Amino acid sequence: MGTYDSEVIVGLKDGVLDPEAETIKRSLERLGYDLQFIKSKKLFEIKLDAESKEDAEKKVNEMTKRLLANPTIHEYKIEIL
């Protein structure tokens, strides 16, 4: 068994309203920045024990589906470091 570091990035799917990003976009434009697009995402750093890298990825994927992301509105990317 080894210890694995992972990162999970969770963001809203295309077409889902992102009020946080819209507020930030308007504020940055008021500060003089010309933006075409901005999207907010969350980064989760997870350290866990697992039998293998594949087992770690399986566990992190399960955690993400069960709690970190709502598959109806979120997309996510998992990386085992």
What are these regions (language model features)?
Residues M1-L81:
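Long, contiguous binding/interaction regions
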